[in-house]
Amino acid sequence: PGPDVKCVCCQDGEECPCKGGECCITGTCCKEGDGLCCGKCSNAACKCADGCKCGSGCSCTLGNCTC
């Protein structure tokens, strides 16, 4: 894996492609210059139920979800 390897990570319920692999564990890839957020969170590192607002009905199954 080179420096241009991408993985899909989640922050604030959004998917974002970014370089490296740690973001897939920490769920923080939407920092400035890191990547562009796009779409709903569906990656294994941070998976939330559809429409999750982090309330009583929130089901965040894996990772550091910040719905």
UniProtKB/Swiss-Prot annotation:
Function according to Swiss-Prot or TrEMBL: Metallothioneins have a high content of cysteine residues that bind various heavy metals.
Organism: Sphaerechinus granularis (Purple sea urchin)
Family that this chain belongs to: Belongs to the metallothionein superfamily. Type 4 family.
Entry keyword rRNA-binding: no
Name of the protein in question: Metallothionein-B
GO MF entry, a single one: metal ion binding
Cross-referenced InterPro entries: Metalthion_4_echinoid/annelid (IPR017980), Metalthion_4_echinoidea (IPR001396), Metalthion_dom_sf (IPR017854)
Organism superkingdom: Eukaryota
Record has Metal-binding as a keyword: yes
